[in-house]
Amino acid sequence: MSTYSFQNFALTLSGPGGSISLGYGSGNDKGGVTFEFNENANTLTTGADGSPMNSLNPGKSGKVTVRLQKTSLTNGLLSAMYNFQRANAANWGNNVLSGIDIVRGDQYACQVVAFTKFPSNTYAIEGGALEWTFDVGVMDPALATGG
């Protein structure tokens, strides 16, 4: 039997201004964390005679979205890190994100990481979530067979 639990997911953002845990225990919203590539790895071209040609795209850029409850103290840590990095261009885009499901073995290694923008923040009847998005220069995934 295979079992999944967000409790087994660890994610760390490290860079100028600190190191912040963004996985289980950081006040995540139900949407959790999403890793997404910007481009397809392949482009299929069909020639005039119908011959197919596959072209491998070497790009590995992507986006990571971390959803935190409005009341998560982690929002304050991310806000401070964002402001610290934005104050000096030498600090911008020098982060690393490391994610792992410690039971199943899935891993994501993300380098050349920058905050995409400060999150939108809605004040309403329900607290909702803040979505922190990060642009990733190089994302290396490895899905495991464990668990």
Indicate residue ranges for each PLM-predicted region.
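Short acidic DE-rich linear segments
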Residues: 143-147
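Short, conserved charged micro-motifs
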Residues: 73-79
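Solvent-exposed edge beta-strands and adjacent loop segments
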Residues: 1-73, 111-133, 141
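Flexible glycine-/small-residue-rich
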Residues: 136
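Short, acidic/charged, Gly/Pro-enriched secondary-structure junctions
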Residues: 79-108
